[in-house]
């Protein structure tokens, strides 16, 4: 018996030895190559088996029984590139971030969807793109990076913003701006109505209150499948902003320091010097008044201008400077146990190119979330305080703007100061006097923005969850404007005028959703969401003014020192929105996808007959590369076809547009009286946009990625503020008058040219072609203004004016087409016919660029471009082409017609312009084509073996240039071919170029 037992034990040990010889224990750690931090939750799988593990809190893993025959581990993690590595006993694996994988998740505001199952059209911009830009507004980072995005901003003044189109202008007269959603909450941008816009004609930019350093990603939602869930506010697209949250892993501190300067980008407005200007003025004065040329020259030089005949004064140079730029950001990010946190602090101070214009912003953000076994509780919050100094940028001009005064009220013969050192030409709007820090003009805006978004989510198990979110957005603005006693507005003897504008916008949103995610039979996935939302918007506004500032000469320009009231104004407004919505997604075998959404909105903005509107979408997608005939294809690695159709709405008009109002204060015979100020319209209803999109996504070799979209968007019941007859006593009223259509193509390519451990080289490009057309107009006549016309069958931004042909080389007179056919010409401006002479919107726009990394060196070069649009420069007609005695452009001074120079480029300059050479015509309509070097960045990251000794995880130094240069059409006259929405520019704030150097530190 004893011998049998010994034999049994011997066999057992031999068996164990054989098994041990056939398996092995593999341990290791997975870290991020980007910051050296552990990658928690990464999947580690033995290739070809079911043996695997998930990395722990230190990025560690253990595989106790790996077959000895196994050679490879497959390691994967969302946001990282999947790697296959050879098996060793103790392993350390560095995972690289996958920018392509970042696109695999689409944030829709109400939730997150896998891009593979997403049937809509969307584009994602990550934090790396934002980090390269210096603009206070994060939206500028989308220009050239996202197809379908058109920026309309003709100024580089800090803190001033224009507008943005997503797939063209979608409305005639109501809001054209996309809906902004920040961390799931709609935010009131309202750059069209009820905005933070005052008589300075500058739109104070509410989005510049959000620090780009706090943003994780921006998702642009375009078609109906992506936007219909937002119903009545989604006609112009949706921009979803996701801020940074607590990250897995240990505590990180990130510091980013940027400093630099702001200078002129490029200049297409070269003004003549004093000698050139005097010759042109004398030519023009002699042509108008007659007499001897030299005697006229002497009169103008000595008596009219008092010129010393040798000095030449550059007024644009006098009001310009090299502005200082500084941007500091500190954030702390991590997760302790079940609690994640992100704390961000930022300070931005940027001086504008023109003296007296600047922006200063303090910002803070706190995002917290705590995860329980069955629930998540969190809050996203931010605060910012912004101070902006500037002046009017109206296309109508304002002599109280130093920029306007410099180019339209001064000449190079006018000195800056008189013989006693005081400001010269004080009665002719000396811009230096306007900018005097002690006694000059003031235009300061202070904006406070508070966002508070607490949320609570319960997970019931089996894919069922419920979430409630409260959003509070408060935007408060105080703006003070002081008009110097030297330059009283409206020619009134005010002895100084101070105007205080205060407003407060509050938006409270509460939404509740319940969702269900379910998978059955291994091939069927379904997700369902039902939701309800309520929103209340309130707007408070007050204005008061005073004059008579007795101590203004000593620098006391505060309203409390003024003596005479000049009026006041006060009002409050409210608007409410109630909504119910549903969203469903289904997929089969991860190849066929269907989606649908429905939303019912009720808005207080519209008439009692049309308070409620229904909006919906359907979408489908086929992943062709998942079929058997392509599954083994190593060249075509992804091919998908998608399509969507649906309706969305637009309610961005004056909140009380459908109601009739009366104003008091109109007394008669000492009896109190009132008069109607608006006409009620109970039939006023939503604009409804029907959106169709078909798209194709294609990838080759997992390196070349192509996306193509065709879209057709038609807006009906377009809202427009119609002028009324003077006999009504009311100037305008809103009506639904027509339809507008945008049809276009989007194309993008992203390719990895070289990809290995040391060298990575990528290239991207995108292109958008869009055609805008007014397809229906219910008014009796087209709607015409000074420069443009809204007419059925033409683009919304159609220029309509007398068409300039050239000059009569025998007489020097300007010529225009006499008739609409364009087969006859005339030198009589009044006899010339108006013609369609171009469209303000570009036909094609987009961007392209490349980025390269080699070991620790990184290099980025980005461009954006426009082709086909027109720009009208009304300021050039008033100034640069010699109207009256205003400084001409150098080219005009040297190349205007004279009897001795009959082959000249420009018509004869004649004082007071009797030939209407500077009247409105296509003479001042220029090509808006341009190619801009939007960003160049060069950086170097020190090796971790150096920095870790100082407890620094990452140290990167870099230099960057924004808007390095803009190549324009040869005939363009202006500082910037990028215009406001109507394509008209005048007295532009010069385009700026920002040079910065920076350091990024991660501890």
What function would you assign to each model-found segment?
Residues 1-365, 369-371, 376-380, 451, ...:
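Short, small/polar-rich motifs associated with maturation and membrane association
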Residues 10, 331, 369, 762, ...:
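Conserved C-terminal beta-signal and adjacent last beta-strands/turns
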Residues 72, 117, 150, 250-254, ...:
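Membrane-spanning beta-strand positions in outer-membrane beta-barrel proteins
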Residues 148, 158, 342, 854-874:
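Glycine-rich phosphate/pyrophosphate-binding loops
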Residues 150-154, 228, 625-632, 945-948:
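Active-site phosphate-binding and catalytic loops of NTP-dependent enzymes
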Residues 176-177, 182, 193, 248-312, ...:
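Surface-exposed loop/interface segments of Gram-negative outer-membrane beta-barrel transport/assembly proteins
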Residues 243, 330-334, 364-370, 452-458, ...:
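Residues on the lipid-exposed face of transmembrane beta-strands in outer-membrane beta-barrel proteins
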Residues 608-612:
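Short glycine/threonine-rich loop-to-helix capping motif typified by GTGT followed
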